[in-house]
């Protein structure tokens, strides 16, 4: 962490980056060095989502986005330096069009739900073939955290979503077990 702090503690960055943003940058950089690629990718996804939405908001209100982008990955650097509509990301961020639509949402609760749905889809896409792996357990935990967050806001909907999740997991585990049996019985 010391190297990350030193790299960020240049005179020009000292003037603009708040301590909260420095801490966030350290958090994401540390998390993205995790030995588990899935976990590292999850944190990078969150960093990228936050940075893209921040850049869109900065553009909308005339702020210099370079002062608000956190982290030093390739996407963060592209966002800081590009004036293109897509921040020079082109096809490298497959969820960029969806994020641009989300950024246009004026209702903050709807916007947050759409962000969580984007993350949920990413979790599903990245654990589809990993039924019995630790990645699926981590994804399950992350989904439960999302549900818990929304249950406090809308109890009836949260309970319904939770029941749907449990039902889907039961169905998925039954299917996986049947497939496992078919493949291993000779």
Regions found by a protein language model. Name each.
Residues 16-184:
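A contiguous, surface-oriented mixed alpha/beta subdomain in the mid-to-C-terminal portion of proteins
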Residues 8-18:
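Terminal low-complexity "docking" segments
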Residues 1-5:
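Short, small-residue-biased leader/transition segments that mark boundaries at the very start
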């Amino acid at each position: 962490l010391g190297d990350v702090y030193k790299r960020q503690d240049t005179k020009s960055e000292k003037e603009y980056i708040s301590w909260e943003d420095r801490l966030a940058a350290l958090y994401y950089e540390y998390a993205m060095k995790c030995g588990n690629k899935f976990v590292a990718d999850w944190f990078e996804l969150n960093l990228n989502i936050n940075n893209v939405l921040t850049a869109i908001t900065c553009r909308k209100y005339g702020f210099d986005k370079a002062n608000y982008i956190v982290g030093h990955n390739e996407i963060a650097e592209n966002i800081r330096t590009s004036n293109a509509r897509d921040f020079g990301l082109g096809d490298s961020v497959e969820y960029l069009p969806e994020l641009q639509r989300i950024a246009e949402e004026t209702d903050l609760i709807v916007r947050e739900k759409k962000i969580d749905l984007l993350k949920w889809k990413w979790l599903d896409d990245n654990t589809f073939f990993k039924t019995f792996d630790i990645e699926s357990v981590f994804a399950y935990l992350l989904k439960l955290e999302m549900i818990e967050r929304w249950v406090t806001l809308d109890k009836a909907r949260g309970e319904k979503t939770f029941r749907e999740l449990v039902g889907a997991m039961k169905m998925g585990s039954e299917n996986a077990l049947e497939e496992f049996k078919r493949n291993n019985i000779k």
